[in-house]
């Protein structure tokens, strides 16, 4: 049903064409404001603490007073153990609590651990869950195993958004990126994202984003 036999060169050429045609007309203040409102303000540091996450959340609480002409960010994204801190500190409406889960960022742990971590994050206040696909399963051709994990975690999330990160730099080709995108959406992903930004060989390129579309 879907053509995943893509040429990297063709994708790059198409992206270059889109950039040339579309960037100038979208380089406007309204578009930039819209994009700002889509941001997940994120802290995923090994040095994060209750105090630092509270301070981080207070910045969002104060945002409307400091920037009354801008809409606030879409969400605050933290590790699952800080979900309750954000929930108890956040005072503004319209900003969700997002948590990474499922053995983030490598996705290398037992499915039972992924399920438990996701359930605990939701119990602590998470509105959205960010996971990474099981890249090892995908690259070894175990598509069923990869999809089953996503389906299990979506069942835990229920009505809450499940955002699935493809880690496109590890997938190497436009064909793999499109295939992983389709499989993730088929398995219940509410959103797909390109990369964690934590892996040294992951370089976000425009043609990788195009392959998601």
Residue ranges of predicted features:
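Charged, compositionally biased N-terminal leader segments and the immediate start
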Residues: 1-35
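Conserved anion-binding
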Residues: 128-181
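Hydrophobic faces of well-ordered beta-strands that scaffold small-molecule active sites
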Residues: 37-39, 74-78, 97-100, 129-131, ...
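Conserved small/polar residues in nucleotide/adenosyl-binding loops
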Residues: 202-209
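Active-site mouth loops of central-metabolism enzymes
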Residues: 41-49, 100-113, 139, 165-176
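Active-site cofactor/substrate anionic-group-binding motifs, chiefly glycine-
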Residues: 72-124
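Glycine-rich, proline-tolerant flexible connector loops at the mouths of alpha/beta enzymes
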Residues: 44-47, 67-77, 85, 131-144, ...
């Amino acid at each position: 049903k879907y053509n995943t036999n893509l040429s990297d060169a063709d994708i790059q050429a198409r992206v270059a064409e889109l950039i040339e045609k579309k960037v100038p007309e979208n380089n406007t203040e309204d578009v930039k404001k819209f994009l700002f409102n889509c941001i997940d303000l994120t802290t995923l540091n090994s040095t994060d603490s209750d105090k630092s996450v509270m301070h981080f959340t207070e910045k969002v609480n104060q945002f409307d007073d400091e920037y009354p002409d801008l809409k606030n960010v879409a969400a605050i994204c933290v590790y699952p153990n800080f979900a309750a801190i954000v929930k108890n500190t956040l005072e503004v409406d319209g900003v969700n609590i997002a948590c990474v889960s499922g053995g983030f960022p490598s996705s290398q742990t037992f499915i039972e651990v992924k399920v438990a971590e996701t359930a605990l994050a939701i119990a602590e206040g998470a509105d959205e869950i960010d996971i990474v696909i099981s890249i090892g399963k995908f690259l070894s051709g175990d598509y069923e195993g990869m999809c089953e994990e996503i389906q299990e975690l979506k069942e835990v999330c229920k009505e809450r958004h499940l955002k699935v990160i493809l880690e496109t730099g590890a997938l190497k080709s436009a064909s793999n990126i499109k295939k992983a995108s389709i499989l993730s959406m088929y398995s219940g992903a509410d959103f797909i994202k390109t990369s964690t930004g934590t892996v040294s060989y992951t370089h976000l390129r425009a043609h990788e984003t195009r392959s998601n579309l």
